[in-house]
Amino acid sequence: MVLGKVKSLTISFDCLNDSNVPVYSSGDTVSGRVNLEVTGEIRVKSLKIHARGHAKVRWTESRNAGSNTAYTQNYTEEVEYFNHKDILIGHERDDDNSEEGFHTIHSGRHEYAFSFELPQTPLATSFEGRHGSVRYWVKAELHRPWLLPVKLKKEFTVFEHIDINTPSLLSPQAGTKEKTLCCWFCTSGPISLSAKIERKGYTPGESIQIFAEIENCSSRMVVPKAAIYQTQAFYAKGKMKEVKQLVANLRGESLSSGKTETWNGKLLKIPPVSPSILDCSIIRVEYSLMVYVDIPGAMDLFLNLPLVIGTIPLHPFGSRTSSVSSQCSMNMNWLSLSLPERPEAPPSYAEVVTEEQRRNNLAPVSACDDFERALQGPLFAYIQEFRFLPPPLYSEIDPNPDQSADDRPSCPSR
């Protein structure tokens, strides 16, 4: 008898969402099928699946041991979230080559269902970073007598949902800073920066309204700017490795001496990025909005406002502090807080982010320069995949103006 051959071995998931993409959360049931197609008749010892979820970090550092001796120090750490095994055909022992242990599979296509439940405890969101990752996968192994096993692995995505409708993420973020430039014995007037955003939590695809006032009482020409940064932190063996990446930015008008610029809701759109990861012990992903003043020949004046990128978008009537920039007409008076009859909610995370977009979106930048211009050219490079048009005209004003701003002395007349 001529034995048949394995033509294909595939894994498919039973997707329960409209996008037909396998996306799950803690406590969900992951189900699917192992699809086997054979030509002719084959004998099988076992068909197994192995499902696993884990976070893993790894990086290396060069060390100097003295006397021109150098060595490499490896830093690795791993956290396992679940480990599930099941046998779809056959038995546990693959070394049993007796005829009694074989199962015959006839020519054609065959499906073998599998199912397992994810832990109820919080799981880290799927992530691919510079020095680590969070991955979830199912692996199928087909074992046959006297032949090498056929193996296949397929990943699926897990989101640990972050609801931005919680009070802590709906609270406004604001700050004020001032800087005085000195050159030898000469001191110029101060440069002041005040900035505020409506809330801390956003989802990809939303635009952040930036309210800011920049006053230039110095003798130099300055430029106000804003940027969204992602910070990846990896932990292993008591050490920490950090990577900072630019995800979006914008530039204001140049300010000459004695001038002031006001941003009344300047828009900065959040591109497709991974949500924040805050509950993993070895990988942490955080975001911040940096509003800053580019000062030639001096350290920049910058103000960091923390952000959380979530997966559950803002409810249309969730809060009076909710951003309505993407749902309301441009001529709506923001001060009156009048809402449209049926505003459209911001897009959900799955609607705007694909795995390919998330991986390709981030452009690495140096994390240790702290905004010093050590190299030629602009401080922040554009992400080539995301070139932003100028923000639309916006006539809305800050509903909660800083009363002390009216009492602040303006630049002296020149």
From Swiss-Prot:
Phenotypic consequence of K48E: Abolishes interaction with ADRB2
Keywords of the record: Cell membrane, Cytoplasm, Endosome, Lysosome, Membrane, Repeat
Record's keyword annotation contains Nuclease: no
Alphabetical GO biological process terms: fat pad development; heat generation; negative regulation of adenylate cyclase-activating adrenergic receptor signaling pathway; negative regulation of cold-induced thermogenesis; negative regulation of heat generation; negative regulation of locomotion involved in locomotory behavior; positive regulation of hippo signaling; positive regulation of ubiquitin-protein transferase activity
UniProt membrane topology term: Peripheral membrane protein
Induction: By troglitazone and pioglitazone (selective PPARG agonists), by prostaglandin J2 (PGJ2) and by L165,041 (a PPARD ligand), by vitamin D3 and, to a lesser extent, by phorbol myristate acetate (PMA) in the promyelocytic leukemia HL-60 cells. No induction by retinoic acid, nor by clofibrate (a specific PPARA agonist). Up-regulated by fasting.
GO MF terms held by the record: beta-3 adrenergic receptor binding
UniProt subcellular location: Cytoplasm; Cell membrane; Lysosome; Endosome
SUPFAM superfamilies per UniProt: E set domains
Motif PPxY motif 1 mapped to chain: 346-349
Chain ranges for the short sequence motif PPxY motif 2 as given in the UniProt record: 391-394
GO cellular component: cytoplasm; early endosome; endosome; lysosome; plasma membrane
Domain of life: Eukaryota
Tissue specificity remark: Highly expressed in skeletal muscle, placenta, kidney, lung, liver, blood, adrenal gland, lymph node, mammary gland, thyroid, and trachea. Very low levels in colon, thymus, spleen, small intestine, bladder and bone marrow. Strong expression in differentiated adipocytes compared to preadipocytes. Detected in omental fat and subcutaneous fat tissue.
Stretches for region Disordered: 393-414
Function: Adapter protein that plays a role in regulating cell-surface expression of adrenergic receptors and probably also other G protein-coupled receptors. Plays a role in NEDD4-mediated ubiquitination and endocytosis af activated ADRB2 and subsequent ADRB2 degradation. May recruit NEDD4 to ADRB2. Alternatively, may function as adapter protein that does not play a major role in recruiting NEDD4 to ADRB2, but rather plays a role in a targeting ADRB2 to endosomes.
Subunit structure comment from the entry: Interacts (via PPxY motifs) with NEDD4 (via WW domains). Interacts with ADRB2. Interacts with ADRB3. Interacts with HGS (via PPxY motifs). Does not bind TXN (thioredoxin). Interacts with ITCH. Interacts with WWP1 (via WW domains).
Family listed: Belongs to the arrestin family.
Protein name: Arrestin domain-containing protein 3
Native source species: Homo sapiens
Lineage: Eukaryota, Metazoa, Chordata, Craniata, Vertebrata
The encoding gene: ARRDC3
